[in-house]
């Protein structure tokens, strides 16, 4: 029998690992599956996207016989953003591969997948938190009543329009004890979205540790003054519907006053005829320029493998009318 040699590509094959990486990323995404993926930028020049959104002209009015109807000005808003890249890289020594302990190549693959998935989810949630519609004041714990108030903010004209509510795992116990909560095992397979724990007030419920806990509040008597250096840090700690600027002051909230901000995302269009047209944009859109790729570099003088994962994309809140931020006491 001829001798066989194990080559480097037998251990680290970027093409094979890239496919596995994509599969693992998809499995680990928590929020991204509830955004629409737009691939119109793939394979075309340019890295900037302008997202339009028409404003409603209002309902029609009664007009008397022989009277000329007044014209209504159409208005639109838009946001422009630049495609960015998310990257993560790890180094593996040849010695660690040779040792055969712990499968370092497989572990690197899993860690890179988790890293890219986490970044995309963070960006999706950040866009959801730009929504202007909110419900509650954060003084009551999560409940059926509070979620009904949040869900009806959409003013749906059709029944049964699918919505997804994201809660922090710390809120799960309270919700499970609510008599109006229906656990996922009570539904037929395929009815619930992947990973949903149940349904309440017309919303399927998913858990995510990325749901924001508000620990600071804007206050003119606050002890911390906002500057360019700490603006991003404290903006992430206050109610997302509050916009901080340099010179503002914030104060820490006592534990009893802290609250979660739970996004409720409307998943369906109000009408099948207008689904995801310019007039009926989805809540959040991921503009994918280049899907996740994996590159492998070998440095023989150091006997080190570098594995680098990257994804080029942009995320935008494309329809703020389809996101409500529900506030519930910690």
Where do the language-model regions lie?
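Sequence/fold signature of self-assembling virion shell proteins
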Residues: 2-34, 42-45, 77-83, 178-330
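Short N-terminal helix-initiation segments at or just after the protein's N-terminus
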Residues: 27-36, 54-56, 103-111, 269-272
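N-terminal low-complexity, intrinsically disordered segments
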Residues: 45-78
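Long, contiguous amphipathic alpha-helices that act as assembly "spine/axial" helices in icosahedral shell
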Residues: 51, 75-137, 155, 159-165, ...
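Flexible glycine-/small-residue-rich
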Residues: 53, 169, 207
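Short, solvent-exposed loop/turn elements at domain surfaces
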Residues: 58-62, 174, 214-215
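Extended, solvent-exposed, turn-rich assembly/linker loops in the middle of proteins
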Residues: 130-203
């Amino acid at each position: 029998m001829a001798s066989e040699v194990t080559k480097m590509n037998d251990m680290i094959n970027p093409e094979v690992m890239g496919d596995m990486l994509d599969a693992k990323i998809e499995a680990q995404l928590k929020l991204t599956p509830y955004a629409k993926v737009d691939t119109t930028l793939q394979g075309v020049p340019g890295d900037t996207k302008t997202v339009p959104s028409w404003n409603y002209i209002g309902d029609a009015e009664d007009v008397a016989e022989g009277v000329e109807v007044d014209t209504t000005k159409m208005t639109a808003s838009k946001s422009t953003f630049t495609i960015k890249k998310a990257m993560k890289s790890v180094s593996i020594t040849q010695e660690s591969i040779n040792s055969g302990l712990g499968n370092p190549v497989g572990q690197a693959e899993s860690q890179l997948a988790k890293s890219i998935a986490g970044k995309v989810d963070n960006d999706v949630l950040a866009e959801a938190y730009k929504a202007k519609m909110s419900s509650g004041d954060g003084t009551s714990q999560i409940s059926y009543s509070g979620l009904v108030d949040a869900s009806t903010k959409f003013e749906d004209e059709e029944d049964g329009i699918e919505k997804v509510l994201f809660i922090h795992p710390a809120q799960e116990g309270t919700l499970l004890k609510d008599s109006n909560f229906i656990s996922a095992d009570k539904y037929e397979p395929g009815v619930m979205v992947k990973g949903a724990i149940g349904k309440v007030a017309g919303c399927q419920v998913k858990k995510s540790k990325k749901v924001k806990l508000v620990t600071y509040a804007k206050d003119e008597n606050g002890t911390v003054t906002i500057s360019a250096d700490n603006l991003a840090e404290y903006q992430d700690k206050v109610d997302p519907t509050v916009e901080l600027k340099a010179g503002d002051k914030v104060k820490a909230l006592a534990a009893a006053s802290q609250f979660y901000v739970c996004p409720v995302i409307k998943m369906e269009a109000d009408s099948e005829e207008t689904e995801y047209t310019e007039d009926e944009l989805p809540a959040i859109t991921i503009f994918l320029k280049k899907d996740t790729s994996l590159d492998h570099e070998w440095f023989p003088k150091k006997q080190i493998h570098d594995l680098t994962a990257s994804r080029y994309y942009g995320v935008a809140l494309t329809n703020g009318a389809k996101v409500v931020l529900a506030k519930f006491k910690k």
